[in-house]
């Protein structure tokens, strides 16, 4: 089994290996590994990597890698394939032979540095999975810096074609795309909303013709609201029509909120962003400490608990793993950690 790990500016490919016992770390000592070994690398043209998606296309494995914006020292690295300086965007790498990854294409992103540019997020769906997609096509959804979402036809990953763009935004981030339905929960910054990031729900079942369903966020974030603005969205995770839940995480490193939403009510309920309509699909909301965020809210549902195996009730639990993100280096903020919430009684989630 192969696993992919992205460092600040490289693609690192590992394979399972024999166990190596960790020793005391010493400057200049050889590298250590446990249950894996280094197979291959690619420097990604020295572009800082954020999110990878590894997709099986035909008889190949293709890595689609989102990048942060450039740095003060190198705002736009040179692309050796074109000979031109290009703002960081999306790297496309053939990793079928992990010992020899082949860089196929760089798609430039928004000009800018760090969080202000690049194309950080990428999702990929097969056309044969999407209800109205071309069954012979493969589609990539990505952010374009802070200003847009883009959909590309990547059937030939070396020659992507832009087919749709959702622009006019003030921010974007880590979206979620259901490949079986085409429903996309896009982390956006609608210009008239009071928060930097909220959710725009789109039907991307026909990727070339996006259809907007609604805007969504926490009451107090909507246009025309007054008072304090609730914590901005970081990202959602949907369980699809079968699970009928969307788990939203608000806050990156402070003021975190876990929100559990009825997916069907979100898609089919009243759309006007009034406080009542925004509350309508919500099942529960769990505020966290002001010191910690809810960067990722990952559902792990119907989990057996070995210690409870003989209990009459509660032998399995619905758990949400909540991951914070540290933003400031050298202890410049509160300690960011991983938390686990029991949402078995979903109207009363509790941290465990």
Predicted regions and their residues:
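N-terminal secretory signal peptides that target proteins for export/translocation
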Residues: 1-2
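Bacterial N-terminal signal peptides
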Residues: 5-17
């Amino acid at each position: 089994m192969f696993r992919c790990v992205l460092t600040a500016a490289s693609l690192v490919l590992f394979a399972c290996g024999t166990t190596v016992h960790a020793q005391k770390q010493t400057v200049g000592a050889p590298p250590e590994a446990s249950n894996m070994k280094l197979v291959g690398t690619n420097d990604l043209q020295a572009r800082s990597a954020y999110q990878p998606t590894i997709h099986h296309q035909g008889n190949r494995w293709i890595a689609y890698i989102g990048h942060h914006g450039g740095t003060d020292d190198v705002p736009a690295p040179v692309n050796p394939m074109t000979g031109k300086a290009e703002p960081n965007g999306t790297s496309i790498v053939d990793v079928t032979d992990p010992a020899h990854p082949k860089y196929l294409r760089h798609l430039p992103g928004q000009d800018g540095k760090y969080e202000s540019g690049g194309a950080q997020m990428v999702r990929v769906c097969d056309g044969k999975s999407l209800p109205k997609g071309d069954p012979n096509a493969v589609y990539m959804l990505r952010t374009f810096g802070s200003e847009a979402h883009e959909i590309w036809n990547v059937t030939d990953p070396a020659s992507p074609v832009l087919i749709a763009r959702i622009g006019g935004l003030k921010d974007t981030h880590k979206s979620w795309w259901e490949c079986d339905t085409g429903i996309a929960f896009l982390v956006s910054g609608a210009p008239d909303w009071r928060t930097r990031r909220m959710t725009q729900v789109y039907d991307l079942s026909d990727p070339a013709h996006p259809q907007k369903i609604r805007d969504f966020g926490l009451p107090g974030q909507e246009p025309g609201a007054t008072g304090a603005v609730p914590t901005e969205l970081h990202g959602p995770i949907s369980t699809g029509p079968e699970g009928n839940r969307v788990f939203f995480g608000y806050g990156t490193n402070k003021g975190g909120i876990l929100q559990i939403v009825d997916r069907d009510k979100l898609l089919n309920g009243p759309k006007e962003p009034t406080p009542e309509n925004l509350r309508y699909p919500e099942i529960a909301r769990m505020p966290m400490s002001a010191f910690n965020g809810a960067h990722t809210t990952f559902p792990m549902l119907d989990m057996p608990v070995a210690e409870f195996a003989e209990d009459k009730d509660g032998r399995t639990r619905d758990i949400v793993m909540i991951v914070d993100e540290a933003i400031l280096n050298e202890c410049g903020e509160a300690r960011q950690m991983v938390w686990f919430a029991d949402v078995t009684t979903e109207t009363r989630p509790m941290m465990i």
